[in-house]
């Protein structure tokens, strides 16, 4: 399902830190299946400020830290179960090792999917030291960058220091190799946007690291994500924007 031939060292940039854009990861049919069945079950609201960044979005576990099976697999479509199986495969880890030059086989993996609805965002930050490398996939079939919700590669902690903006379109993905300078953010989703920004973060941790998304003893209530405008409403909104530009 994932085109692992695209995982080559040449895909990584050295500026402003080690990161890379990898596109065209799925065939049209697989991409359509993943977009059409993006998970809505077992989400929790993630919101706060941790001393470095502010954040607000909805998150669901796809693969728990160090697990060998998908989370809540009975609620996943066939396409999403296949994707989870590929992420758990030795072939995917080998491709990540080839891409980054790091030994992904010895790292602990966690995978979460997210909906970013209106006003959702993730402020400028560098990842925690426990995170070695993160691979972010996107699952929107269309997206207006004016609606925000785009991963922003930064050259410093200031949101204005933009190096690259990546829209969350199906087949797009970004690899971030953690460093003291690996600043990035997700721009706020515009309040008038009713199509969630959909992503999946595959994070490789140092062995023995705890999950910050799902800490031990976490009792946060889970819910079905319902913050979505009906298809006709989305179409009408797009037509209105085209008319008013």
Where are these regions (language model features)?
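Localized chelating/binding microdomains
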Residues: 12, 20-22, 30, 38, ...
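Substrate-binding/active-site groove segments that recognize
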Residues: 135
């Amino acid at each position: 399902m994932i085109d692992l031939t695209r995982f080559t060292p040449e895909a990584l940039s050295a500026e402003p830190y080690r990161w890379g854009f990898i596109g065209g990861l799925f065939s049209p049919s697989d991409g359509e299946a993943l977009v059409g069945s993006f998970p809505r079950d077992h989400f929790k609201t993630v919101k706060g400020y941790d001393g470095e960044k502010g954040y607000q979005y909805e998150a669901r576990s796809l693969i728990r830290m160090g697990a060998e099976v998908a989370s809540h697999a009975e609620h996943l479509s066939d396409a999403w179960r296949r994707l989870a199986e590929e992420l758990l495969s030795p072939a995917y880890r080998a491709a990540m090792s080839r891409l980054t030059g790091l030994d992904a086989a010895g790292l602990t993996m966690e995978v979460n999917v997210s909906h970013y609805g209106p006003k959702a965002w993730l402020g400028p930050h560098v990842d925690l030291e426990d995170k070695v490398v993160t691979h972010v996939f996107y699952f929107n079939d269309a997206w207006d960058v004016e609606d925000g919700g785009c991963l922003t590669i930064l050259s410093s902690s200031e949101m204005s220091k933009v190096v690259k903006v990546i829209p969350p379109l199906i087949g797009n993905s970004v690899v971030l190799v953690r460093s003291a300078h690996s600043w990035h953010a997700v721009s706020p989703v515009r309040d008038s946007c009713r199509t969630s920004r959909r992503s999946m973060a595959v994070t490789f941790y140092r062995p023995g690291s705890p999950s910050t998304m799902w800490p031990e003893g976490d009792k946060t209530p889970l819910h079905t994500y319902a913050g979505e405008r009906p298809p006709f409403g989305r179409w009408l909104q797009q037509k209105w924007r085209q008319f008013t530009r």
